[in-house]
Amino acid sequence: MSVSDLRQSYEKSTLLEDSAAASPFDQFSQWFDQALAAQVPEPNAMTLATVDADGQPSARIVLIKGYDSRGFAFYTNYESRKGHDLLANPRAALLFFWQPLERQVRIEGRVEQVSAEESDAYFHSRPLGSRIGAWASRQSQPVTRAELEAREQEIRARYGEQPPRPPHWGGYRVVPTLFEFWQGRPSRLHDRLRYLPDGRGGWAIDRLSP
């Protein structure tokens, strides 16, 4: 079978205007809870797309670590490629793909750093190995495996079981300016609902052609 012959018919659900939540945050919460209930693998995994100062895009999978009406938070090394991209161009796009439910959620928005207190709280909730790793990894820089493991041992010896949060590590929050909810439907006539700010503190919903 060739790649062009790979097809799947989407028939599991619908997404209609009269049943969609008025708030995209509420709609996201409903779908996220359903992904959890369906035991979708890593439902908090999302594609994060950024663009550097020269307009070169890059994308990677990261894990969302919190969301509320302020936006969607994730944590990383500020000196990584994504960190440099966001310093030059503080805008990003997110994409959640919950394949077992035949659903996608796309989010666009501006990006801000979370507070130091939020970064500290999340950092100290992580397993020890992950906290050590945040120090050991000079993210996105070339390294050999031996160098990386030596650095890990050095950090363990220095900090023991209480490493502080590195100054180059912390959180970002994507503050949405657009949501799109996608539900697969038969014959590629998918449901796509877009939410945009209505200028009055709420959100306007429209249907997009599939």
UniProtKB/Swiss-Prot annotation:
Positions annotated to bind substrate: R7, Q8, S9, Y10, K65, Y122, R126, S130, R188, L189, H190
UniProt cofactor note: Binds 1 FMN per subunit.
Top-level enzyme category: oxidoreductase
Residues that coordinate or bind FMN: 60-65, 75-76, 81-82, 104, 139-140, 182, 192
Function: Catalyzes the oxidation of either pyridoxine 5'-phosphate (PNP) or pyridoxamine 5'-phosphate (PMP) into pyridoxal 5'-phosphate (PLP).
Family membership: Belongs to the pyridoxamine 5'-phosphate oxidase family.
Protein name as it appears in the record: Pyridoxine/pyridoxamine 5'-phosphate oxidase
Biological source species: Bordetella petrii (strain ATCC BAA-461 / DSM 12804 / CCUG 43448)
